[in-house]
Amino acid sequence: MKTLRNLFPLLLTLTLLLCTASGAVAGTTDDGFVDYAAQLQLNMSSATAKTSATVRTHVDGDTVHFDVPESVCADGVLKARFLALNTPESTGKIEEYGVAASHFTQEKLASAVSIILESDSDRWELDSTGGRMLVWVWYQPSEGAEYRNLNLELLQNGYARAYSTANNQYGSICSSALDQARQFKLNLY
C-alpha cells in the first residue's frame, strides 16, 4: 500500500504530461483536425496596415461594415470584403451554406471583445468593385485570449471557397485549412 501511495504522484505527473503533450494543446484533435486559426498569430509590429474596429453592419459571410477611426476612412466606416475567400450568398440569391456562413461570421464578431482589421500590405486596398476594402479580420473571443483570424476559420470550417488565396501573406496556411475542410467534408465540401 505504501508503494502505491508513493507511486500515485509519479503516475499523476506522467498522466498530466502525456495529456499536455497530446495534439489538443497544439491545436490538433484526436481525429487529426488542425485548428489553423489557433496556430496563426496576429503580428501587431508587422508592416501591414491595421486598425481597431467595431461592427456597424453585418452584411453576409464575407462582407461586414466596421466603424473605424476617421484616419482610416473619412466617414469612419470601412466596408470590408474578407481576403482569400468567398462565402456562398446569403442575400438576394440564397446559396447553399450562405446563411450558415453568414451566421458563423455574425456569431464570432458579436461575441468578440476586440476586433482588429489588417490589410495585406502597408495600405488599405480596394476590392475589384472599388467599394470595399480587402481585409483580414482578427477577433479576440474573450479577455486575455489570443486573436483569431476569422478568414482562416471560415476556410477551415468549410464555410468558404478559396478566392485568390495563394496571392496573399497567409496563402499557405489558408490553403492547408481549405485542404483540411475538403478532407473532412465540412459544410461546402
Where do the PLM segments sit?
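Small beta-barrel nucleic-acid-binding modules, primarily SNase/OB-fold domains
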Residues: 9, 19-189
